[in-house]
Amino acid sequence: MQMQPQYHFHPMNDVLFETQSKIIKDLAAKEDCILVGRCADYNLGEDCLSLFVYAPYEERVKNVMERLGREEKSARSLVKKMDKTRKAYYEFFTDRKWNDLGNYQLCIDTSRFSQNFLLNMLADVYKHM
């Protein structure tokens, strides 16, 4: 498979972002969908409900330890690395601050609610849009 001519002199990260952006926009135009990450809020603008889910650092470390069976030091390292990676990606492609809650219409601290409650709440939000 050969790369499209318009992409020959573009960095691969830019080509990938442009391709993902097109897929996100095409998918959202066809049907309602849930998109996690990939700067979907930026790509879709006001045509979507943008949601930012977060939790305190210690809670995220605890979740990594429980879900992935990691030791505390390893879990802390992974959480920091993921935050750094997400921040760099989002800020590079959007020129926005990654964890600026003002970029989103709905922000939820997941440490304060059960997963079941959050799913029901989001289903209700969707029904009333």
Give the positions of each predicted feature.
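ATP-dependent small-molecule kinase phosphotransfer cores
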Residues: 1-32, 70
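Small-molecule kinase domains that catalyze NTP-dependent phosphoryl transfer to phosphate-bearing small molecules
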Residues: 1-3, 71-116
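Short, amphipathic alpha-helical "lid/cap" segments that border enzyme active or binding sites
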Residues: 21, 115-123
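Solvent-exposed alpha-helices and their adjacent loops that cap or buttress functional pockets
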Residues: 26-27, 43-44, 98-101
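Short, polar loop motifs at secondary-structure junctions
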Residues: 36-41
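Conserved phosphate-donor/acceptor-positioning beta-strand/loop module used by diverse small-molecule
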Residues: 46-81
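A common structural junction motif
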Residues: 126-129
